[in-house]
Amino acid sequence: MTVQSKLQGRGKFKKRFFRAGQQVPRPTLELSSVWLSKIFYNPEQHHNKQKMIESGITTRMSGIHENPGQSHHTSAQDYRLLTTDPSQLKDELPGDLQSLSWLTSVDVPRLQQIGGGRPDFTSSAQSSLLERQTAQLNSMTVAGGAGSAIHLQSEMQHSPLAINSMPQFSPGFPCAASVYQTAPQQVLTFTQANQQCSPGGLYGNYNSQNLFPQPRITAHSQDLQPKCFPKPIYSYSCLIAMALKNSKTGSLPVSEIYSFMKEHFPYFKTAPDGWKNSVRHNLSLNKCFEKVENKMSGSSRKGCLWALNPAKIDKMEEEMQKWKRKDLPAIRRSMANPDELDKLITDRPESCRQKSVDPGMTRLPSCPPGQTLPLAAQMQPQPVVTLSLQCLPMHQHLQLQLQNQSRLAPSSPAPAQTPPLHTVPDMTNSSLPQHPAKQHTDFYTVHTDVNSEVDALDPSIMDFAWQGNLWEEMKDDSFNLEALGTLSNSPLRLSDCDLDTSSVTPVSSAGGLPYPDLQVTGLYSSYSAIDALSNQYMNTQGGTKPIVLL
């Protein structure tokens, strides 16, 4: 190739790679060195470099040259890279290629290695060596019977940079002692069981083994994860009522309501604290709950107690049963112990349990002195009340039994539309006989403000019993229904009514015995009969006359 053709090729290279305002791209070391060695080859320099190589590293490279099946010819590229004087390349290079003189910098470390007596191998020699060793490992098979041993010999070879190279397994691969230093042999013994395998198969089987069975790991991880409980479908008012119903006293502080909800519904253990505000709001605003006095407020226990409104207990139980019928599986999933659901709904504290009452009898609750009891609000739509009053101790021989039969008719007018009272004869000026051995005293005193010996509203003296149809009995007894007095809700005094005294025969000349005030609200009353002992003093001609009690 002539110089002109070389220059033409250089011109193409210049047009292709050189651009205005750009630096020369740096090609790889291998391509640049080959390209330069082909263009600038000088036989004289080749002869000088060959002498230097023979004197320096020929003996050390003999191990590679003597390998069978491998020929190593020193190329111009190797000699070019071993140039010791970078100025020679600079002088030989044309002016337009002097910028490529940085390629000669690779000679400095190589010359230092040669001077220090440490051999270096080219990348091509190392790659060919590794390829042969890999092929030998893959082609080698190890055969053995039961109890036979396989001896694998490995030699540790040191590279120029003190890095261990791969072990040699083939005895037919010679290695010069001057280049490689053999380390002590390591004998590895493996016991095989009637199988043929390669070293790659051995390592592959080992790597594919699992130290722990996968199902066991999965089960263990599932045990560590806590069970997730959904939010209960019950409203906060139902949950609060459930907590109060299952308490010993029927009342709890707010903190114990929280504890009950977290114990039976674990969702609230990890839920945000906003649910506690909802509980407090329900306690304050819902009429089903009422605040009660804390009897232990003087001790270390502080805060108020909350209890169920007794009138709302049945309503709350109905609400719980409704949600239970609506979605029972969802409720059971949200509970820590689903078997306790029925117990939580139906149980009541002792203070809230209804006392068993005779189906034929009911008792009127007591009323504080000086107050009237609204009987009309406590009675069923059609009750018949029999009032039995005991006599005072000073009138033990005179038994006066007042049986007042009344009925709250469904068609009765409202208190604001109550018609005026029927007037009856006045008996305030009449006198009743008294026992000969007794001094004159008041005949009957029921007013609670005056006499504390008799409590007209005490259940021990007032007994209310359910009777049959009042109107049929009145017809049989020839009662005059039109004469029944109709009362308003305001208390009525007997002293305000006029009673007929023409049929009453006074026995003594003592002063009249006035009736005291008897207060009862909202009853239709009639005087039906008197005791047999009083027949000698009072004549009941023409049937009984209705009088108004209260």
UniProtKB/Swiss-Prot annotation:
The UniProt disruption phenotype note reads:
At 36-48 hpf, mutants exhibit pericardial edema due to dysmorphic hearts that fail to loop and form and atrioventricular (AV) canal. Hearts show continues peristatic pumping rather than coordinated and sequential beating of atrial and ventricular chambers. Endocardial cells remain squamous and AV myocardial cell shape fail to occur.
On whether Transport is a keyword of this UniProt record, the answer is no
What are the GO MF terms of this UniProt record?
A: chromatin binding; cis-regulatory region sequence-specific DNA binding; DNA-binding transcription factor activity; DNA-binding transcription factor activity, RNA polymerase II-specific; sequence-specific DNA binding
* Organ and tissue specificity: Isoform 1 is expressed mainly in adult thymus. Isoform 2 is detected in adult skin. Isoform 3 is expressed in adult brain and embryo. Prominent expression sites include the olfactory placode, the basal layer of the olfactory epithelium, the neuroepithelium of the developing retina, the germinal zone of the differentiated eye, regions of motoneuron development in the neural tube and periventricular regions of the brain.
Which region ranges are annotated with the description Disordered?
Answer: 402-437
| Keywords of the record | Developmental protein, DNA-binding, Neurogenesis, Nucleus, Transcription, Transcription regulation
Any Pfam family hit:
Forkhead
Give the function comment from the record. Transcription factor essential for neural and some non-neural tissues development. Binds to an 11-bp consensus sequence containing the invariant tetranucleotide 5'-ACGC-3'. During development of the central nervous system, required to specify the amacrine and horizontal cell fates from multipotent retinal progenitors while suppressing the alternative photoreceptor cell fates. Drives commitment of p2 progenitors to the V2b interneuron fates during spinal cord neurogenesis. In development of non-neural tissues, plays an essential role in the specification of the atrioventricular canal.
Q: What is this protein called?
A: Forkhead box protein N4
Q: Gene encoding this polypeptide?
A: foxn4
